[in-house]
Amino acid sequence: MTKLTYKKASIAVAVLLISSSFTNAVHAADEHNVVPGLTAVGKPLGLHGIDPVAFINIGNRISGSASFTETYDNVAYYFSSEDNKNAFKKNPSKYVPQNGGFCTFGVSVGKKFDGNPKFAAVKNGKLYVFLNEDIFKLFQKDQDGTIMKASQQWQKIEHVAALSL
């Protein structure tokens, strides 16, 4: 292989590696509600940086720290302690927000809206987030029905870009 051909091949490999990392971030952004941009670990941030373990275990919205980051399904989550990070690592599906972190009420009607952890509920050990206070109040009127509809709709829209819905 000549120097020029080797250099071109090296550049092509580098471009492929870089573009594949962006593809993962875009993939996560379509299936998970994430904050724009990437974290220090190269993945988008989920749950607005709130510690999901603290949320589920003690019902408290504690901001996590980049010092305690764990990645699951191409999304980075911040934790308030090493213990919480380790608990998540052992069983991430117990702690991640349902419906990819999108607004549960929105998902129940086939849409992907921001899920804001300021408006959230833990029901049957699962975390559900909502767009705003008004939507959260609608959810409170029929929690089981909304969750059931969201679960059915999520199967249809999980892999569909939010802007396409």
Describe each region flagged by the PLM.
Residues I18-V26:
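C-terminal segment of classical bacterial N-terminal signal peptides
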Residues V26-Y78, E82-L165:
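Charged, low-complexity intrinsically disordered segments
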Residues T2-A12:
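Bacterial N-terminal signal peptides that target proteins for export
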Residues T2-K3, I18, N60, G110:
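Generic marker of residues within folded, mature protein domains
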